[in-house]
Amino acid sequence: RASVILHEMAHMWFGDLVTMSWFDDVWTKEVFANFMAAKIVHPSFPEVNHDLRFFLAHHDTAYRVDRTAGANPIRQPLENLKEAGSLYGPIIYQKAPIVMRQLERLVGEDLFRDGLREYLQTFRYGNASWPDLIDILDRRADAGQGGLPAYAAHAARSHLPADGARGTPYE
């Protein structure tokens, strides 16, 4: 129950304070709500192996869905607002958390947290996109050497390699 309550509270920042520019990035508000809820809940339950729970909750479904012929990328273009409901599903709720968690591990927890703060401060009461967040993290991570945009492109692709290639969300 705590996770659900905190998920909805996280939408006050990710979804309300900063709203996606368009529904292409609807996944960001959902993944951040889950991501932040987990960050807050975990310390209250130190006896739980949260990494194992995450793995069991997301990896199997993400692999299965992403490997199908009709798999969609996380970041999907939306031409008709009437079809916005079609964007929600296992790709957003199972694969997107893997991408976000890997991104945090790629840049480090402190840089990721500070980047999120800058993102919320910069775009408060406005709109932002996935590339906006990546630009902030990339600038902070390696003085703009361009490493994160290549990783972030995974959100726009389906059928990610499952061979353990560096930089894939399935590592």
PLM features per residue range, with description:
Residues R1-E171:
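Hydrophobic alpha-helical and helix-loop surface patches within well-folded domains
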